């Protein structure tokens, strides 16, 4: 992981001791907007629930610290506070990064999810194999009832039944592997996205609640001392 400081100047040096009402309104709008956009919008190469999206503020500038993968690190960053915009520049040979849905897993979450997937696929395998075996057993009962007077046919049918059971086992196993190959990435994406939503929702709420404090009762240094919620 590579951490990047994204800084932008809110106040010139002459405004260090005199913050105007326009500056207060700008900060009230800008800081929560960037907090939520960095955490939610997929166009930003941040999407990582375990990274530090921390706000560092003082009288001269505000900085956002966020982490990206080394191969998705932008070459330049620019922020326009007046338009509430944040732009990135990437190399021509590099594709625009998209969220890595597998990264938000911790070790314990990934181990638990793998156990659940293993149980789910074994359950599918058991159901598929039991259905095939039950169908063949039903056929064998019909055969025994209608052809009980031919012993040689009993032996042939028993051999045929063993072959069919083995083939059904192979078919169930191949079906299980194909399901795992096809649906495992999708299930991982769905699970990681669902696990991400409450954190992102709380992140936005807590950022807005902790940052949007009336400037008559606090200061930038008090805002800077607030704990990070990411």
Swiss-Prot record:
Membrane topology: Multi-pass membrane protein
Keywords annotated in UniProt: Cytoplasm, Membrane, Nucleus, Signal, Transmembrane, Transmembrane helix
Entry keyword Calcium: no
Bilayer-spanning residue ranges: 27-47, 118-138, 150-170, 172-191
Signal peptide extent: 1-16
An example Gene Ontology CC term for this record: nuclear membrane
Compartment(s): Cytoplasm; Nucleus membrane
Entry keyword Membrane: yes
Source taxon at top rank: Eukaryota
Name the record gives this protein: Uncharacterized membrane protein C17A2.10c
Organism: Schizosaccharomyces pombe (strain 972 / ATCC 24843) (Fission yeast)
Lineage: Eukaryota, Fungi, Dikarya, Ascomycota, Taphrinomycotina
């Amino acid at each position: 992981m590579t951490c990047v400081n994204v800084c932008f100047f809110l106040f010139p040096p002459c405004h260090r001791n005199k913050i105007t009402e326009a500056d207060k309104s700008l900060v009230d709008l800008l800081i929560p907007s960037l907090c939520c956009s960095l955490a939610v919008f997929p166009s930003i190469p941040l999407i990582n629930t375990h990274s530090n999206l921390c706000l560092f503020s003082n009288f001269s500038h505000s900085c956002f610290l966020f982490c990206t993968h080394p191969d998705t690190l932008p070459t330049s960053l620019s922020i326009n506070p007046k338009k509430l915009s944040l732009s990135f520049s990437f190399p021509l040979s590099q594709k625009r990064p998209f969220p890595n849905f597998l990264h938000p897993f911790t070790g314990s979450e990934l181990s638990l999810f793998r156990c659940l997937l293993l149980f789910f696929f074994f359950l599918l395998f058991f159901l598929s194999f039991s259905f095939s075996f039950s169908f063949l057993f039903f056929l064998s009962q019909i055969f025994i009832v209608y052809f009980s007077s031919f012993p040689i046919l009993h032996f042939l049918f028993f051999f045929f039944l063993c072959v069919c059971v083995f083939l059904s086992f192979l078919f169930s196993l191949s079906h299980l592997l194909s399901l795992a190959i096809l649906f495992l990435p999708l299930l991982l994406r769905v699970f990681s996205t669902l696990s991400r939503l409450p954190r992102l929702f709380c992140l936005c709420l807590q950022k807005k609640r902790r940052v949007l404090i009336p400037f008559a009762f606090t200061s930038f240094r008090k805002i800077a001392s607030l704990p990070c919620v990411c």
